[in-house]
Amino acid sequence: MSLDKRILSLMPYRLRQLLKLNSPYSLTINDKKIVVPLNVQDSIYNLYITRSWKTEVIGYFTKISGGVFVDVGANLGQTLIEFWLTDPRNSYVGFEPNNTCIEYLETLIDINSLDGYKVIPVGLFNENKILPLYIQNNLEADACATVVENLRPGRKYDVDSIQCQKFDDVFPELNTNSISLIKIDVEGSELEVLQGMTATVERLKPPILCEVLFTDRKADLMFMCHRNEILVKLLDKWEYSVFQIVKNYNSSKIIDLKKISSFSIEYWNLSNKDLCDYLFIPKENEEYLKLILHQ
């Protein structure tokens, strides 16, 4: 990390504001340059992005299947940047309901002239409705924001109202008939997101990279277990297999893809915090996964 980037990353956001040090920063990742806006509180963490296990997965599927990459829960463009690292010429569609994040993403796309990239300012769900978005106090671009009220009991939240839609209703507007990969990181509402894309998934059979969280220590373990059982039944109906992604010590590489038939019933802790990512793959395409491990 360069000295100026290190100094910026150590400064509190408010101090950077006072010193007018929130101008976009030109970042080089693996000899590729991208300009990163720093005008939002947690955007400083984008300075740390580098190639990771996720870059491997995105690059593999966009290479073999083409089509648009769908980023559900785009937040501050963390996955957008990793997608850009694979091949900036590919098409990207991000879904994000948080207004602060939407403005940031649009700026990121605009200042880097990322043609073929766009953000749709809605959340995804299993019906078209307005929902409350629970955002941690004083974190306007909260990466852990959720529409699940009791996902993390005891935390203090600001509540915003967001428009949510079914992916099946939005997809025709994307003017494409091919999806290379769907990434879902929606802090507990992955079941409803997937239910809302049933018609599209059954027709196109895209691979899906999805975070499924372990239960918060203060939350209802059996409630989360029941939701995950419904999720497994949905994937079975689609004839999809589930693989848990096992990463190396610094999450730069995938070391194993563990096929599972159910999600673990356990609380989140430091030992399992990096085991929340899964690949949902059509059963007939399971053999493709062997190539990911040998890239």
PLM feature segments, named:
Residues 32, 47-70, 130-132, 146-204, ...:
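Short internal loop-to-helix segment that lines adenine-nucleotide cofactor pockets
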Residues 120-122, 240-249:
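Conserved S-adenosyl-L-methionine
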Residues 74, 124-126, 167, 186, ...:
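Hydrophobic pocket-lining residues within nucleotide cofactor-binding pockets
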Residues 1-166, 172-176, ...:
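S-adenosyl-L-methionine
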Residues 164, 225-238:
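Short alpha-helix
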Residues 205-212:
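Conserved beta-strand signature within the Rossmann-like core of class I S-adenosyl-L-methionine
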